[in-house]
């Protein structure tokens, strides 16, 4: 995969452009939802490259919608405040204090930083959260059952939500006027309480509601690996019918579980393809979308 990257960076530039042309034509005027997250968020150069790619998508007639996470930065902030991070099934347990920290990091820090980068690269960004314009209405997740020493326990995840209703009107208005929406995964319940929703899940739900052509989920690994220690075991294509079996087999674990379930739900909901890519690779968005081989894992609907 890294050899592929080097090939494109050192090959003839005109060949790269010619290879990209049919993809640019195919994707023109389509919506693409791009979930930005992982440790790439804390590397300024990688983050700048990602945003530059997204601004380029807008300039060639594609309508990108950014959903961002911020898990590493939330964890770092909690560590500095002496608060322990706890996860169940890849989801952060979110009490009142954790919710306030998450909101501060996601809305007050990361969102504004991405909007500023869009402006730096010549685009126009608008920062939003799921609460704006009643964009994302959610309900609190039910208690989760976990096994501790073979004994089943109920665990309350706190202010963690499941999406109930997506109102895409504000996003459609923003994109129709040439802006790139940047969305924090903070939603609201029927009583006005803020709920933390997994960013991959939000991205998938928005992709469905917006009839997106593509959903791109960024992670810290080169896609789905059968062996987490060996990047040569990357699975380049996964049918939606394979996802639950891969979870059962232990190939998918931790934060990759909600990511791939979101990918599965999106494809089943009508999104053409979902791409899981390593956001730390320079210009990974362009390499995945506009080259024949791609660099990550593609989730598709098996029509057999």
Swiss-Prot record:
Class of enzymatic activity (EC top level): transferase
Catalytic activity reported: N-acetyl-L-glutamate + ATP = N-acetyl-L-glutamyl 5-phosphate + ADP
Binding site for substrate: 70-71, 92, 196
Entry EC no(s): 2.7.2.8
InterPro entries: AceGlu_kinase-like_sf, AcgluKinase_fam, ArgB, Asp/Glu/Uridylate_kinase, Glu/AcGlu_kinase, NAGK-C
Keyword Heme recorded: no
Site (Transition state stabilizer): 35, 259
Record-annotated disulphide pairs: none
Molecular-function GO term, any one: ATP binding
Location (main, coarse): cytoplasm
SUPFAM superfamilies in the cross-refs: Carbamate kinase-like
Functional pathway: Amino-acid biosynthesis; L-arginine biosynthesis; N(2)-acetyl-L-ornithine from L-glutamate: step 2/4
Top-rank lineage group of the source organism: Archaea
Annotated localization: Cytoplasm
GO BP terms, alphabetized: arginine biosynthetic process via ornithine; L-arginine biosynthetic process
TM region(s), chain numbering: none
Keywords: Amino-acid biosynthesis, Arginine biosynthesis, ATP-binding, Cytoplasm, Kinase, Nucleotide-binding, Transferase
GO cellular-component term (any): cytoplasm
Known function: Catalyzes the ATP-dependent phosphorylation of N-acetyl-L-glutamate.
NCBIfam families: argB (TIGR00761)
Protein family according to the UniProt entry: Belongs to the acetylglutamate kinase family. ArgB subfamily.
Protein's name according to its UniProt entry: Acetylglutamate kinase
